[in-house]
From Swiss-Prot:
Disulfide bridge partners, by residue number: none
Protein transport is among the record's keywords: no
GO cellular component term of the entry, any: ribonucleoprotein complex
NCBIfam families: PRK00504.1 (NF001764), PRK00595.1 (NF001860), rpmG_bact (TIGR01023)
PANTHER family from the UniProt entry: 50S RIBOSOMAL PROTEIN L33, CHLOROPLASTIC (PTHR43168), LARGE RIBOSOMAL SUBUNIT PROTEIN BL33C (PTHR43168:SF2)
Gene3D superfamilies assigned to the protein according to its UniProt record, in alphabetical order: Ribosomal protein L33
Naturally occurring in which organism (per UniProt): Cuscuta obtusiflora
Subcellular location: Plastid
Name of this chain's protein: Large ribosomal subunit protein bL33c
UniProt keyword terms in alphabetical order: Plastid, Ribonucleoprotein, Ribosomal protein
Originating gene: rpl33
Length: 66
């Protein structure tokens, strides 16, 4: 039997600090995390505070489109 695709889907969280300060940073790259969320309970964009190895601090990571 095939399993139904539920409301839970994979999302990508991207560092908002790396995207904004891309022109004057020491390290190249953007921090991204992959996680899951329930689209029925959280229909709007998800934002979590995670550690960014490029900014060297905890900063808000926002959901991006695939």
């Amino acid at each position: 039997m095939e399993k139904k695709k539920g409301a839970r889907g994979n999302i990508i969280l991207e560092c908002t600090g790396c995207v904004r300060n891309s022109h004057n940073r020491v390290s190249k790259g953007v921090s991204r995390y992959i996680t899951q969320k329930n689209r029925h309970n959280t229909p709007n964009r998800l934002e979590l505070k995670k550690f960014c190895p490029h900014c060297y601090k905890h900063i808000i990571h926002g959901e991006i489109k695939k």
